[in-house]
C-alpha cells in the first residue's frame, strides 16, 4: 500500500524579518520511494511561525486529490495548534480562551481548509537533531528565504 509523507520547516532571519518555508514530500511503497517532490517559498517580512504554517499549508495544498498523509513538523506551535487548539478557536470565532484574536488566524484558517479534504496524521520531531528529511526541509526553507535576505556588502 502506498503511503504519503511530508516533512515541513520554516526559517526566519530576524523575527520578524525575511523568511522561508520548505517541504519534502515522498510517496512510498513500503521501503521503496515512488516519488519525491520538494517545495519552497518565502516572504520579505514575516515570522518563523508564519513560515512554519506556510510549509504545512503548502504540503497539503500540493495534493491533487483527497489523500492520507503523515505531516512531520519540528514546530510544536503547528502540531499543537492544528491538533488541539484549533477546535476551540473555531468555536470561539477565532479567538483564544482569553478572548484575544488568534495570531496568524488567516493562515490557521487556510490550514484548516487545506486539511479538511485529507486524512492527516500530524507528528512532531525535534528540529536540528539529525533527521535527514527534516534537515532537507530546513535547507529548502533557507533556500526559500534567500531571495528576500538583504545582500551583504563586502568591503
UniProtKB/Swiss-Prot annotation:
Is Nuclease one of the keywords UniProt gives this record? yes
Q: Which Pfam families match?
A: RNase_H
Q: Which InterPro entries match?
A: RNase_H, RNaseH-like_sf, RNaseH_domain, RNaseH_sf, RNaseHI
Q: What reaction does this enzyme carry out catalytically?
A: Endonucleolytic cleavage to 5'-phosphomonoester
Which residues does the annotation say bind Mg(2+) 2?
Answer: 9, 138
One biological process GO term for this chain? DNA replication, removal of RNA primer
- Which top-level enzyme class is recorded in the Swiss-Prot or TrEMBL entry? hydrolase
Per the record, what is one GO cellular component?
cytoplasm
Question: What does the note under cofactor report?
Answer: Binds 1 Mg(2+) ion per subunit. May bind a second metal ion at a regulatory site, or after substrate binding.
EC assignment: the record states 3.1.26.4
Keyword Protein transport assigned? no
Domain RNase H type-1 residues, every copy: 1-146
Give the SUPFAM superfamilies listed for this entry: Ribonuclease H-like
Any one GO MF term held by the record is: nucleic acid binding
CDD domains the record matches: RNase_HI_prokaryote_like
Specify which residues bind Mg(2+) 1 according to the UniProt entry for this protein.
Answer: 9, 52, 74
Query: What superkingdom heads the lineage?
Result: Bacteria
Regarding protein family, the annotation reads:
Belongs to the RNase H family.
Q: How does it assemble?
A: Monomer.
Instruction: Check the record and name the HAMAP family matching this protein.
Output: RNase_H
> What exactly does this protein do?
Endonuclease that specifically degrades the RNA of RNA-DNA hybrids.
Q: What is this protein called?
A: Ribonuclease H
Amino acid at each position: 500500500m502506498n503511503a504519503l509523507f511530508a516533512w515541513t520547516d520554516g526559517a526566519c532571519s530576524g523575527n520578524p524579518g525575511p523568511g522561508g518555508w520548505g517541504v519534502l514530500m515522498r510517496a512510498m511503497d513500503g521501503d521503496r520511494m515512488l516519488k519525491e517532490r520538494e517545495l519552497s517559498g518565502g516572504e520579505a517580512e514575516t515570522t518563523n511561525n508564519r513560515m512554519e504554517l506556510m510549509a504545512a499549508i503548502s504540503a497539503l495544498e500540493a495534493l491533487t486529490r483527497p489523500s492520507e498523509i503523515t505531516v512531520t513538523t519540528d514546530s510544536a506551535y503547528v502540531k499543537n495548534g492544528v491538533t488541539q487548539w484549533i477546535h476551540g478557536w473555531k468555536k470561539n470565532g477565532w479567538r483564544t480562551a482569553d478572548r484575544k484574536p488568534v495570531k496568524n488566524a488567516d493562515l490557521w484558517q487556510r490550514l484548516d481548509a487545506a486539511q479538511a479534504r485529507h486524512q492527516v496524521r500530524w507528528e512532531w520531531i525535534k528540529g536540528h537533531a539529525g533527521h535527514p528529511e527534516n534537515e532537507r526541509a530546513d535547507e529548502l526553507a533557507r533556500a526559500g528565504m534567500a531571495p528576500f535576505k538583504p545582500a551583504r556588502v563586502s568591503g
